Amino acid sequence: WPEVSEVEDVEPDMAQAYVEELIRRERSGGRIGRVMASLRKLDRACRITGVFGKDAPPLLPYITDGGLSGFHSEPRPVAYFPEQAERIIEWIINIDPISARVLHVMQKTGLRIREAVYLRAQDIDVATCIITLEGDVNHTKGGRPREVRISPEEIPFLSEIKAIGEKNPTGHIFHDRGSLPDRVREQVRKACKALRIPCLGTHGFRKTFAAQNYKNRIEAGADDDQALLDTSIQLGHNRKDVTIQSYVPPQDRRN
């Protein structure tokens, strides 16, 4: 609302629409919770100072008054089961094969959604099964570069997507990169609803990769700490605690 420059002009539907947009973009529960708390603090302060009348409707009603449910920052290391991920992709592929391909990239490489849509042919080394991300060029979080090692079983897939990128002047595998993430998110929501699968958003596919990477490392002889740290590095983190908190549930770990 660029036309709104004064706090007294902020309406409840604006506040609710802003929070709903954060939800649609799959922002973290912690961030959404902080935004909601800030809006309610603003509401209280404006009533105390007389900017809002005492009888004015709340900027952001609580759930008991018909508002949005609360959000918290506690991470959940819950992924789609491999068969769930495949069902979602199969549902989407018939109506939006491009979105389905993005999800396949996330599932098989662990890339974040923006990293996936900005992936280029020149980032993929099929012979070594390594994807090299160059920070801002690949839209990595914080602009940090990293390498992701992919299972040799995925060589046919890597060859396929690399060939797609090689047909484009920039090497990018996907077009419409600015709008594509939101499109993919919407398709995932529709698929999960239709298939009655608990929706974990697009990030659930990254978690599916993380769970499989941890399992592969354990099967290759790594201990729990080594497998956790390797998975964190693959995902673009540098602490095993991140994997423990957000990616690999306790029941799937070897302690």
Across the structure, where does each feature detected by a protein language model lie?
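DNA breakage-rejoining catalytic core of tyrosine-based enzymes
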Residues: 67-87, 140-152, 169
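Conserved tyrosine-mediated DNA breakage-rejoining catalytic core shared by Y-recombinases
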Residues: 118-157
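Basic, Lys/Arg- and aromatic-enriched nucleic-acid-binding interface segment
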Residues: 82-113
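N-terminal core-binding DNA-recognition domain of tyrosine recombinases/integrases
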Residues: 1-73
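Alpha-helix N-cap/helix-start motif at helix boundaries, enriched for small hydrophobics
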Residues: 102-103, 114-119, 231
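Catalytic-site neighborhood detector that most strongly recognizes the C-terminal catalytic loop/helix
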Residues: 234-255
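Active-site/catalytic core of tyrosine-dependent DNA strand-transfer enzymes
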Residues: 151-214
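C-terminal catalytic core of tyrosine-transesterase DNA break-rejoin enzymes
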Residues: 104, 208-239
